[in-house]
């Protein structure tokens, strides 16, 4: 009995060792780091930071085209946080929800628009950061830490009383739920991004470049939906943790 439980636990822990494609490894001391994640992640961050600087450099009371676009994005992200977390608590969490959404969107679009697998390197291959299970698991664990912090900061130790509500019989199920949340977030994002990259790469290799365009457009749409789902669920989990348990 206990042997099976340990095997199940080990399968969850070993999820970070899942490898798809040929990774570009950097060796630092005794550790091996996925270099393609660092390279493409920094490219995505540079693009996002550059857009943010360009969009906020010359702010005016009468917004121009680019400023209008940036304000639209900000209002969209504010609405996600406000609708899921609540009007009184959402402002503190806007930076986190916005960062999660924009990073995932940028990473997904990088994978959908750029055929990284066609770029030859002496060793390994480039890919979108969200094409690596380690990245998606890390993002999901950040969300787990965020909603634990939200619950403890709002309700103190009383936050853990939710595990025995509405009855102590549900304690194991409520504890298991906290493990399934990051797993579902990470695998959903990883699976969708990986599938999209593989489809685009195969079509690009088999047929002329114009044929895969509809697939790439569909990939952009699906990538945007995945970023929206991840950030919305993250905000929903935080909002759930901030609720007063046991209150009418």
From Swiss-Prot:
Stated role: Key component of the proton channel; it plays a direct role in the translocation of protons across the membrane.
Major subcellular location class: plastid
Gene3D superfamilies: ATP synthase, F0 complex, subunit A (1.20.120.220)
The keyword NADP appears for this protein: no
Name of one Pfam family that matches: ATP-synt_A
A single Gene Ontology CC term: chloroplast thylakoid membrane
Top-level taxonomy: Eukaryota, Rhodophyta, Florideophyceae, Rhodymeniophycidae, Ceramiales
PROSITE patterns to which the protein is assigned, alphabetical: ATPASE_A
UniProt name for this protein: ATP synthase subunit a, chloroplastic
Record note on quaternary structure: F-type ATPases have 2 components, CF(1) - the catalytic core - and CF(0) - the membrane proton channel. CF(1) has five subunits: alpha(3), beta(3), gamma(1), delta(1), epsilon(1). CF(0) has four main subunits: a, b, b' and c.
Keyword line: ATP synthesis, CF(0), Chloroplast, Hydrogen ion transport, Ion transport, Membrane, Plastid, Thylakoid, Transmembrane, Transmembrane helix, Transport
Annotated transmembrane regions: 35-55, 94-114, 133-153, 202-222, 224-244
UniProt-annotated location(s): Plastid, Chloroplast thylakoid membrane
Protein family per UniProt: Belongs to the ATPase A chain family.
């Amino acid at each position: 009995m206990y042997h099976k439980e340990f095997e199940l636990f080990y399968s969850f822990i070993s999820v970070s060792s899942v490898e798809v494609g040929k990774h570009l490894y950097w060796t630092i001391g005794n550790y091996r780091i996925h270099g393609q994640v660092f390279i493409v992640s920094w490219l995505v961050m540079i693009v996002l930071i550059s857009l943010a600087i360009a969009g906020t450099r010359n702010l005016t009371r009468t917004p121009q085209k680019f400023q209008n676009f940036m304000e639209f994005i900000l209002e969209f992200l504010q609405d996600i946080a406000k609708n899921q977390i609540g009007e009184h608590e959402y402002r503190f969490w806007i930076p986190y929800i916005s960062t999660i959404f924009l990073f995932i969107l940028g990473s997904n679009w990088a994978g959908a628009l750029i055929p990284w697998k066609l770029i030859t390197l002496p060793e390994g291959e480039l890919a979108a950061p969200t094409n690596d299970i380690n990245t998606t698991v890390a993002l999901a664990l950040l969300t787990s830490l965020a909603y634990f912090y939200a619950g403890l900061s709002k309700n103190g130790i009383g936050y853990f009383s939710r595990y025995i509500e509405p009855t102590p019989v549900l304690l194991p199920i409520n504890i298991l739920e906290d493990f399934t949340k990051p797993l579902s977030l990470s695998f959903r994002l990883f699976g969708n991004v990986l599938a999209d990259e593989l489809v685009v790469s195969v079509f690009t290799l088999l047929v002329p470049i114009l044929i895969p365009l509809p697939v790439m457009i569909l990939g952009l749409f699906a990538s945007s939906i995945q970023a929206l789902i991840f950030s919305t669920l993250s905000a929903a989990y935080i909002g759930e943790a901030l609720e007063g348990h046991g209150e009418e």
